[in-house]
A protein has these predicted regions:
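A motif-centric signal for short, conserved binding hotspots located
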Residues: 102, 107-129, 193-194
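Short, recurring structural edge motifs at helix starts
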Residues: 40-46, 128-132, 168-171, 180
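A cross-family detector of function-defining hotspots
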Residues: 19-26, 55-107, 134-199
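N-terminal, intrinsically disordered, polar/charged segments of Gram-positive cell-envelope systems
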Residues: 1-51, 55-61
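Generic preference for hydrophobic/aromatic residues in regular secondary structure cores
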Residues: 2-4, 95-99, 114, 120
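Periplasmic/extracytosolic POTRA-like scaffold domains at the N-termini of outer-membrane
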Residues: 34, 45-51, 130-137, 145-147
Length: 199
């Protein structure tokens, strides 16, 4: 069996506080946590984890970091996940997508499907590039009111801030590991979103 464990590096490490929250809203309807349709949108077009390839995003004109997208033609070993491909959201602000090769042979990264989306929020700022199937300006309380049974819910209370991590996960049927949704909050405001897929 193969263990797939990828630790995503935060692109945005900002911990600045604000009473305001992002005014963004979802462009895709439905449940906040939907394992049958793990979707995200870029520039208003909807894509699905486990189905959409990196090449489709390239063909649609998604603006990637030049250094990252130069690796799209590189070979990705079987049963492997790529490094992140950064998508510019604003000044010093990037989302990331990752691809996964679940075949028995090497493939180029561009041929592989999107397996993970990472979206950091800048509290008090908005962007119109990436969105999800839920309001990305929701609070911790709004998430828990809509999705009542998280797999894991952790709270850390520091001297000046409180962070909460809420996860909704399922076991992979092919690999040893879990996949799903992770929401990270700072003082109740959504700060990081990670959606990852495993077959």
């Amino acid at each position: 069996e193969i263990v797939i464990e990828t630790e995503t590096e935060a692109v945005d490490e900002s911990t600045e506080t604000a009473d305001t929250k992002s005014a963004e809203t979802a462009t895709i309807g439905g449940s906040y946590v939907d394992f049958d349709n793990m979707q995200f949108a870029i520039n208003g077009k909807t894509y699905t984890l486990g189905q959409t390839t990196l090449q489709e995003l390239i063909d649609d004109g998604v603006t990637f970091n030049e250094d990252d997208i130069a690796n799209a033609s590189n070979n990705l070993n079987k049963n492997s996940q790529s490094s992140g491909f950064r998508i510019t959201l604003g000044d010093y602000w990037s989302g990331q997508v990752y691809v996964f090769n679940d075949s028995d042979a090497g493939k180029t990264a561009s041929e592989c499907y999107i397996s993970e989306v990472y979206l950091p929020m800048h509290i008090g700022e908005t962007q119109n590039v990436m969105s999800c199937a839920f309001p990305v300006d929701m609070t911790l309380y709004e998430l828990l009111a809509n999705e009542r049974d998280p797999t894991d819910n952790r709270t850390y209370e520091g001297e000046s801030h409180t962070t909460d991590t809420v996860e909704y996960k399922k076991d992979s049927t092919k690999y040893y590991g879990q996949y799903g949704y992770k929401f990270e909050f700072l003082d109740g405001n959504l700060q990081y979103i990670t959606i990852d897929y495993l077959p």
